[in-house]
Amino acid sequence: MLTLKLFVYAVVVFFISLFIFGFLSNDPGRNPGRKE
């Protein structure tokens, strides 16, 4: 049961990361050397 819970958390974090990376990639003012 704990393994299933960790797996679900990992998938959720993975999708959130994809969403954030997609949002940043669509930002025309994106600069790899700048952190906001």
Curated annotation (Swiss-Prot):
Domain of life where this protein originates: Eukaryota
Membrane-spanning intervals of the chain: 4-24
Bilayer topology: Single-pass membrane protein
PANTHER family with a match to the protein in the record: PHOTOSYSTEM II REACTION CENTER PROTEIN I
NCBIfam families tied to this protein: PRK02655.1 (NF002735)
Function text: One of the components of the core complex of photosystem II (PSII), required for its stability and/or assembly. PSII is a light-driven water:plastoquinone oxidoreductase that uses light energy to abstract electrons from H(2)O, generating O(2) and a proton gradient subsequently used for ATP formation. It consists of a core antenna complex that captures photons, and an electron transfer chain that converts photonic excitation into a charge separation.
Provenance organism: Pinus thunbergii (Japanese black pine)
Localization per record: Plastid, Chloroplast thylakoid membrane
GO biological process: photosynthesis
Protein name: Photosystem II reaction center protein I
A cellular component annotation (GO) from this entry: photosystem II reaction center
Record has Membrane as a keyword: yes
Pfam assignment, any one: PsbI
Gene name of this polypeptide: psbI
Protein family per UniProt: Belongs to the PsbI family.
Oligomeric form and interacting partners: PSII is composed of 1 copy each of membrane proteins PsbA, PsbB, PsbC, PsbD, PsbE, PsbF, PsbH, PsbI, PsbJ, PsbK, PsbL, PsbM, PsbT, PsbX, PsbY, PsbZ, Psb30/Ycf12, at least 3 peripheral proteins of the oxygen-evolving complex and a large number of cofactors. It forms dimeric complexes.
Matches recorded under InterPro entries: PSII_PsbI, PSII_PsbI_sf
Keywords per UniProt: Chloroplast, Membrane, Photosynthesis, Photosystem II, Plastid, Reaction center, Thylakoid, Transmembrane, Transmembrane helix
